[in-house]
């Protein structure tokens, strides 16, 4: 019986060894699968990290593009407002230039009139009133006279027609205005024609 017990035990032992080998093989196989899964997992994580980095870069690029587009729209809006403002201010430029000879002629008529003649006096008063009203109306639209007599010569506002020696005036001073200049909303549309002291 002891032999039989030994035999059974040997058979059982063989069976246990066989099962242990199977378990070890299964464990090795499972370990290999786990390693493979771990490698796949690491590869997938690396792939996902790369995709995330790429997406973050794209988002940043898109945000930069949106900011640039907003800035461009703001600049365009500002330029358009400035152009509209400039167009409003200087829309009357050509019209104002055409009115200047009318003002000049009214002033010449006032200067040339004989103030002693009683017949002409009422006409002269009418011309003076017309001139004053006309100048006041165009001033409402930004047309302003440049009459620099006695001021320092400024080439931005004055056009020197002649330069003469004068003991009564400082050098580079406007002695005489031959024709008044005009500006429209701060922009010179006709410089004053002047005689300058040397």
Swiss-Prot record:
Pfam families: GrpE. This is Protein GrpE. GO terms for cellular component: cytosol. Disulfide bonds: none annotated. Keywords: Chaperone, Cytoplasm, Stress response. Homodimer. It comes from Vibrio parahaemolyticus serotype O3:K6 (strain RIMD 2210633). Participates actively in the response to hyperosmotic and heat shock by preventing the aggregation of stress-denatured proteins, in association with DnaK and GrpE. It is the nucleotide exchange factor for DnaK and may function as a thermosensor. Unfolded proteins bind initially to DnaJ; upon interaction with the DnaJ-bound protein, DnaK hydrolyzes its bound ATP, resulting in the formation of a stable complex. GrpE releases ADP from DnaK; ATP binding to DnaK triggers the release of the substrate protein, thus completing the reaction cycle. One of its GO terms (biological process) is protein folding. It comes from the Bacteria. GO terms for molecular function: adenyl-nucleotide exchange factor activity; protein homodimerization activity; protein-folding chaperone binding; unfolded protein binding. Its main location: cytoplasm.
């Amino acid at each position: 019986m002891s032999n039989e017990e030994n035999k059974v035990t040997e058979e059982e032992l063989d069976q246990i060894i066989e099962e242990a080998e199977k378990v070890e093989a299964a464990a090795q196989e499972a370990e290999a699968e786990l390693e493979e899964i771990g490698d796949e997992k690491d590869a997938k994580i690396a792939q996902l990290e790369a995709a995330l980095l790429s997406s973050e870069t794209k988002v940043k690029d898109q945000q930069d593009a949106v900011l640039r587009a907003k800035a461009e729209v703001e600049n365009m809006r500002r330029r358009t407002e400035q152009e509209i403002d400039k167009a409003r201010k200087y829309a009357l430029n050509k019209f104002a230039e055409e009115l200047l000879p009318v003002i000049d002629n009214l002033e010449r008529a006032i200067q040339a009139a004989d103030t002693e003649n009683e017949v002409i006096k009422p006409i002269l008063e009418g011309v003076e009133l017309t001139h004053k009203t006309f100048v006041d109306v165009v001033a409402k639209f930004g047309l302003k006279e440049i009459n620099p007599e006695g001021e320092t010569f400024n080439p931005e506002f004055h056009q020197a027609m002649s330069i003469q020696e004068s003991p009564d005036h400082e050098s580079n001073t406007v002695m005489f205005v031959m024709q008044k200049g005009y500006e429209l909303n701060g922009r010179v549309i006709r410089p004053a024609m002047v005689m300058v002291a040397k």
